[in-house]
Every structure is written in C-alpha cells, then in structure tokens.
C-alpha cells in the first residue's frame, strides 16, 4: 500500500456501491455530507484494522458490485488521507480514506452493470469474482456476457474454484435464478473438457 493524493484525471469518476444508504457493516452514510471514519489507521496491513471507507472507480467497480444495490459518486474532501490499495483483486482500483462524501444515488441495474463491464480494466484474474458479483446481484445479461467472453476450457477450473469460494460463503448458491443459471453453465463448460 502507499499513500496517494487523489486528483481527478481524465474525468475519472470515483464510485461507491452501498445497500441503500448503509454499508454491509451497517455504517449509516450521510448523503451529500462529509462522512468521517470512526477508525482509520493508514499504516495497518489488514483492511479490518485500517478502517476508513472503501471506494473504486469506473474501470474497476464491476468487481465490487455485490457490495450494494445503489451506486454513488464519491467526492474526496480536501483534507482527506487516501490510500490506494495495491494488494487487492483490482490494483489501482480500490481506495480507502478517512473521509468521504457520497452523492448522486442511483439504483444499479443490469444495463448499468453491463456498461461497467464494457469499460472495465480489471485484471483477467479478477473476472471470476466479478462474474460471481454480478450473478449474486441478479444482473443476468452482464453475467452471461462475462461467461461468454471470458470462460473457456482452459480456465474453467479456476472459474469454478473462485465461484465455489465466493458462493459457498453465506450459502449464496441458490440466491437467485442468475446464480443457478451461471453455476449450471460453468458445469456444462467443465463437462466439455
């Protein structure tokens, strides 16, 4: 990890995905106001010890869409410490800060998820978990496109391993029709091997 002062470059949009206005850890966000982290240790190695607020950008948000059903634009207040997380699934696409403003709430749709897929620059190794994320959120068209574009006989074992790792947590395997469909399609590809 390294300390980074964020400046908007080339109209880069910073984004945060949240369930309505609460994080998955029950933090209640104030919309259009400065949110200040109760805990932030920029030198911590473990994300839980670091605290703060995570956010991403348009090029990497696809991987993190399972973190909520609404997407917000992120504004970084001037006196904010921001860390770019290099040791993660999307290096250069996950940031953590002690302060954040979330604004411009939009419900994430399958069409939006597909647009993020078309813009994404996540590494190939992050696509299996991105497939899991969009499947879990029931973005069927996006999931089917990732499956069609990315999964093949050469990488099917890796996709199934990552799928099982993600979906076996919290018994997500039967979460919705898209999860069931993609799971079945992955196993059909495996059978072709």
Predicted regions and their residues:
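Charged, long alpha-helical assembly modules
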Residues: 147-193
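Short, flexible beta-strand-to-coil junctions
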Residues: 17-23, 74-79, 136-138
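Intrinsically disordered, low-complexity repeat segments enriched in small/polar residues
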Residues: 16, 93, 101-108, 112-113, ...
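Active-site-proximal loop/hinge segments that shape catalytic or ion-binding/gating pockets
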Residues: 87-148
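ADP-ribose/NAD+-binding catalytic cleft of ART/PARP-like enzymes
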Residues: 2-50, 66, 186-193
């Amino acid at each position: 990890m390294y300390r980074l002062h964020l400046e908007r470059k080339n109209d880069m949009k910073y984004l945060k995905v949240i369930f309505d206005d609460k994080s998955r850890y029950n933090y209640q966000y104030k919309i259009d106001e400065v949110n200040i982290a109760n805990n932030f240790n920029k030198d911590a190695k473990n994300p839980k010890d670091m605290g703060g607020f995570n956010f991403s950008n348009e090029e990497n948000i696809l991987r993190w869409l399972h973190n909520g059903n609404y997407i917000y634009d992120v504004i970084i207040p001037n006196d904010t410490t921001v860390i770019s997380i290099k040791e993660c699934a999307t290096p250069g696409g996950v940031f953590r800060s002690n302060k954040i403003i979330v604004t411009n709430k939009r419900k994430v749709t399958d069409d939006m998820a597909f647009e993020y897929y078309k813009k994404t620059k996540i590494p190939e190794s992050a696509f299996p978990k991105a497939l899991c994320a969009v499947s879990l959120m029931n973005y069927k068209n996006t999931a089917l496109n990732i499956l069609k574009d990315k999964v093949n006989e050469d990488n099917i074992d890796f996709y199934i391993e990552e799928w099982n790792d993600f979906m076996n947590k919290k018994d997500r395997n039967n979460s919705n029709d898209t999860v069931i469909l993609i799971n079945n399609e992955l196993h059909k590809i495996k059978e072709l091997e």
